[in-house]
Amino acid sequence: MTLDLHELKTLLDDVSEGHRLTVDEAENLFKVRDRSSFFITAAADALREKRCGNAITWVKNQNINCSNVCVNSCGFCGYSCKPGDSKAFELTPELVGEKAALAASRGVTEICTVSGLHPAYDLNSYLSIYQAIRENAPGVHIHASNPMEVAYAARKTGCSTREVLEAFRDAGVGTLCGTAAEILVDEIRDVICPEKISTDDWVRIIKESHNAGIRSTATIMYGHCESVTDQVRHLSILRDIQDETHGFTEFVPLSFIHPGTPLYRKGMARPGATGREDMLMIAISRLFLDNFTNIQVSWVKLGLKMVQIGLMSGANDIGGTLYEESISSSAGAKAGEYLDPADMRYISEDLGRTLVERRTDYSPVH
């Protein structure tokens, strides 16, 4: 169904007054293609202001990628290598500790670590990584791993995913990365990441994580071979989980970076999302995910100019400094590995909004 202008404005007014968007209504919003898109972004930004105020938040964090060696071969990934590849690397716990110590010296409040599914990794491998971080960066929040890594550690160790999560928690993991979600539609997963866990397993592990006291982020990767219907199914799954667990700290839309990926080179994906699609993904996420407070716009994926558009389209968070970033850059992203808070302040002040440093749980640092 194509919404005429009157129908669009009426729907947006209803949402601003508390109406929960249906799946069909969200699909219709995603299909808006002309300047009426700006009515959607304006409504989303007004809702952002009502829900979050005018602060733009950011976190001083450092990314540590422990290895790019991976048993999987996801079509959207330009980062992973097989054992013996010339670009393959693996950090020992000692090297992870050195990076963690450097991060601590920079004053970060969060260290984020993810890894390829290394064939030699088991639960103890992950625990040794967390121990190295904890010992070398005491007091720094550990934001680590994702449901795929949890499932992998469980399989390699012969224990349950719940036991893995409890071990992660006891080792100091504060929050789980909500990545490996991609698109939570198995027909699409079978194309882009057939070796990854199913939608049901991802949902189950995320719920187990939340129930174990480990909150997580939530993500979507869009702009490849999925449809608008698939996108909204994904958002609906996340909204249902949040209704049940209240365990998501934020939602992070991740725009597909195409140039260096097998999926694109084989003609199985389009060349990423358009600017309109990026803008509407942020805006409609704000309108549809009425039980999420925080919507993050990814500078790594979009670059600073599009980030600023996202901050006018419903987003309230700009992510982190990172210092190191390998996964998106390997796929062809050009935004770099580090975002200076001075640049964050520049675009925030240009919007007449205040930049506020936060912790992982969104409490202010100062």
Swiss-Prot record:
Pfam families: CofH_C, Radical_SAM. Keywords: 4Fe-4S, Iron, Iron-sulfur, Metal-binding, S-adenosyl-L-methionine, Transferase. CDD domains: Radical_SAM (cd01335). It catalyses: 5-amino-6-(D-ribitylamino)uracil + L-tyrosine + S-adenosyl-L-methionine = 5-amino-5-(4-hydroxybenzyl)-6-(D-ribitylimino)-5,6-dihydrouracil + 2-iminoacetate + 5'-deoxyadenosine + L-methionine + H(+). Its EC number is 2.5.1.147. Residues 51-290 form the Radical SAM core domain. Pathway: Cofactor biosynthesis; coenzyme F0 biosynthesis. [4Fe-4S] cluster binds at C70, C74, C77. Binds 1 [4Fe-4S] cluster. The cluster is coordinated with 3 cysteines and an exchangeable S-adenosyl-L-methionine. The keyword Iron-sulfur applies. GO terms for molecular function: 4 iron, 4 sulfur cluster binding; 5-amino-6-(D-ribitylamino)uracil--L-tyrosine 4-hydroxyphenyl transferase activity; 7,8-didemethyl-8-hydroxy-5-deazariboflavin synthase activity; iron ion binding. The keyword Iron applies. Its cofactor is [4Fe-4S] cluster. Consists of two subunits, CofG and CofH. Catalyzes the radical-mediated synthesis of 5-amino-5-(4-hydroxybenzyl)-6-(D-ribitylimino)-5,6-dihydrouracil from 5-amino-6-(D-ribitylamino)uracil and L-tyrosine. Belongs to the radical SAM superfamily. CofH family. This is 5-amino-6-(D-ribitylamino)uracil--L-tyrosine 4-hydroxyphenyl transferase. The gene is cofH.
